Amino acid sequence: MPAALLLAGYLAIACAGESALHQAVEKGERKLVEQLLTSGADITVRTESGETVLHYAAFPKDAWFATRLIAAGADPCALNNAGESPLFWSALEGNVAVARTLLRQRADANARDAKGNLALHAAAHNGEAAMVRLLLPQTKEPNARNREGLTPRDYAAASGHTAVVKLLEGAHQ
């Protein structure tokens, strides 16, 4: 029944402006995502805080969602109201598979959010070592300071992520 209602458009927009497509992607519902896209779901719809469905592809640990959404026309460089890209969200979630997909589609690892943070700041803060390893070669300024004057290494150190600190120390040279 939920799929039929979603496809019929009865639940097109839910709380916080999430579309049925946002919800299906977030929950990792491949079949429903495919049905919604095939039925003409709006790939450009945003939540009240500006997230596209591609931002939500950071949640399921499956790059299929990002690949499929980009093939349907989703913008890998789209920013939400806080200036965060889908790559930034993938870094926060530690979703390396999605981040790799986004980078292949020209997502910008050097884009900064409204606070001046790179995706590398987000990955370092959360101790996502695999993500840091992926982002380091893509980041022009791995020691970039955000508006508070903090580097990704500062975030990793403050959060007690020693393995990430060691990775980032090599970037100081």
Regions found by a protein language model. Give the residues of each.
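N-terminal segments that cap or nucleate solenoid repeat domains
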Residues: 15-52, 56
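Ankyrin repeat A-helix N-terminal signature
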Residues: 23-28, 56-62, 89-95, 122-128, ...
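Ankyrin repeat domain, specifically the short helix-to-loop turn at the C-terminus of the second helix
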Residues: 34-42, 67-75, 100-108, 133-141, ...
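Bacterial N-terminal signal peptides
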Residues: 2-12
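Conserved ankyrin/ankyrin-like repeat signature
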Residues: 31-32, 64-65, 97-98, 130-131, ...
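Leucine-rich solenoid repeat scaffolds
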Residues: 142-173
